[in-house]
Curated annotation (Swiss-Prot):
Belongs to the UPF0216 family. This is UPF0216 protein PYRAB16100. It holds the Pfam family DUF61. It comes from Pyrococcus abyssi (strain GE5 / Orsay).
Length: 136
């Protein structure tokens, strides 16, 4: 079974090659002439300035410095019917984008039904990515 698990992990890593090597803060990206990051496969990902400005309009200065982009929308092998967003600021942004009410307590993990994924990606195509997560 160990060999099968290694093969699955290799394939998941290949599928996730579009993920960033490192994420950058919204603040840093706004200060760049051409906002971009390098992906795991060596290619470059550019952010639309209009999207960055939309995100900045939803947050205060401290949150702008804290928000790391692109936001990762996790698709798990365990909770296949959900997407998971990690981080208080990230969760706050997604709630606002979807028009949800302000949370009384800001939770660091937001779990949403998977059918929200296309809507989020349609609104934030360059500032979000989806990642496939293998959990045994």
């Amino acid at each position: 079974m160990e060999r099968v698990e290694r093969i699955i992990e290799f394939e998941i890593a290949r599928i996730n090659s579009h993920l960033p090597r490192a994420r950058k803060s919204l603040k840093d990206l706004l200060n760049m002439e051409e906002p971009m990051i390098t992906l795991r496969d060596g290619s470059v990902h550019y952010f639309k300035r209009q999207e960055l400005e939309l995100l900045a309009s939803l947050l205060d200065e401290e949150e702008i410095a804290m928000l790391r982009l692109p936001m990762v929308l996790e698709i798990s092998t365990v909770e296949r019917d959900k997407i998971i967003i990690r981080g208080k600021v990230e969760a706050k942004v997604i709630r606002k984008i979807l028009g949800f009410e302000e949370a009384i307590i800001e939770e660091p993990i937001l779990k949403l039904p998977r059918y929200y994924l296309p809507k989020i990606r349609r609104i934030l195509p360059t500032t979000t990515v989806h990642a496939f997560i293998v959990e045994w």
